[in-house]
């Protein structure tokens, strides 16, 4: 994060961080057809900004946005597959944000590329009843403390 530094005590590279996504490799996620380039991740707060690339037909399964989630669609479209907003879609050049507590699954019929901003990682609802983060860790164990310290 960037902030005004009192009396200019820090060098530019100590408070401004340039990320070069073109020089980064796509990392697979546990969700088939979904890859990510993490541009910012703060493990203390859960804030994350990522480029997400989806293959045609890829599904992001049942999940809840614990806080506001923001997505800008760079390519393709993102469609709610299930949930209260089933069928709503954001197309290339459109921006969609979701309120805290919103829950759905989403898919990309033709594939897509998104810039996603999370204030805290999503909760994924597994078929066996566990609630996990995107890496498969138990959400409460990793992220449940945030905002309670």
Regions found by a protein language model. Give the residues of each.
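Short, charged/polar surface micro-motifs in flexible loops or helix N-caps
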Residues: 44-46, 55-58, 77-79, 102, ...
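Glycine- and acidic-residue-biased ligand/ion/polar-headgroup-sensing regions
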Residues: 56, 65-83
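Short acidic-glycine-tyrosine-enriched beta hairpin
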Residues: 81-103
């Amino acid at each position: 994060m960037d902030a005004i530094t009192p009396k200019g005590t820090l060098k530019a590279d100590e408070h401004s961080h340039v990320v070069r996504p073109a020089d980064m490799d796509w990392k697979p996620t546990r969700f088939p057809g979904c890859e990510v380039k993490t541009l910012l991740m703060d493990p203390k707060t859960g804030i994350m900004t990522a480029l997400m690339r989806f293959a045609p037909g890829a599904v992001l399964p049942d999940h809840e946005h614990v806080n506001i989630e923001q997505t800008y669609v760079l390519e393709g479209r993102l469609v709610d597959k299930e949930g209260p907003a089933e069928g709503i879609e954001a197309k290339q050049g459109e921006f969609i944000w979701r309120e805290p507590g919103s829950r759905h699954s989403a898919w990309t019929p033709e594939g897509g590329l998104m810039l996603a901003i999370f204030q805290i990682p999503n909760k994924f609802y597994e078929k066996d009843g566990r609630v996990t983060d995107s890496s498969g860790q138990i959400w409460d164990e990793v992220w449940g403390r945030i905002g309670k310290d």
